[in-house]
């Protein structure tokens, strides 16, 4: 392993030791739809340890994406609290929440959301540039992560010149470049063919172990979910722990 890869093994978000990187207690979320109050989340609870891989499964429309948005501070719960690295995420000011989110959380989506006019390198460097890191330093860090996900040789290519699997690898690199404690992934393999999905999922599992980064992964694929440490099913707004899948 080269020096740049070695630097990735020290997550910067672990500034204060805490048993859980992410906790949610009593999370409820309701929407008004057609004049009716629709409850999507009802007293949902979960906790995620450092380096743990948690799969969230459930029927389409059950509220899995809404749950991730609440966990990531992108949406406010109607009730309940989310804590990140032991800090009361949902009680912080918007500025404090944004700062903690940028330091402790990463995001991966089904559609990569890469900026088409920028190279893979500059897409991955973007979160660091937002932190006001110099262009040179940000690109150096970004290249190290791209090499880690097997995309160093494609760093100068734009998203339109990459395959679906390659674009998702770049998206994973972008999520990891800030060395987050936890990555929230919403159907990260849902837009990929079976073989490519398996490769990308294996990459996330490997990075979770080697970097001690937690992953909360929403997926419809029971086989992929079974390779995580734990599975929780969202049903009627409530999270239920699933029994371990036999290996």
Curated annotation (Swiss-Prot):
One of its GO terms (molecular function) is transmembrane transporter activity. ATP binds at residues 58-65. Its main location: membrane. It is a peripheral membrane protein. Gene3D superfamilies: P-loop containing nucleotide triphosphate hydrolases. GO terms for biological process: lipoprotein localization to outer membrane; protein localization to outer membrane. It is found in: Cell inner membrane. It is an enzyme of class 7 (translocase). Keywords: ATP-binding, Cell inner membrane, Cell membrane, Membrane, Nucleotide-binding, Translocase, Transport. It comes from the Bacteria. It holds the Pfam family ABC_tran. Part of the ABC transporter complex LolCDE involved in the translocation of mature outer membrane-directed lipoproteins, from the inner membrane to the periplasmic chaperone, LolA. Responsible for the formation of the LolA-lipoprotein complex in an ATP-dependent manner. The complex is composed of two ATP-binding proteins (LolD) and two transmembrane proteins (LolC and LolE). NCBIfam families: LolD_lipo_ex (TIGR02211). This is Lipoprotein-releasing system ATP-binding protein LolD. It comes from Paraburkholderia xenovorans (strain LB400). The gene is lolD.
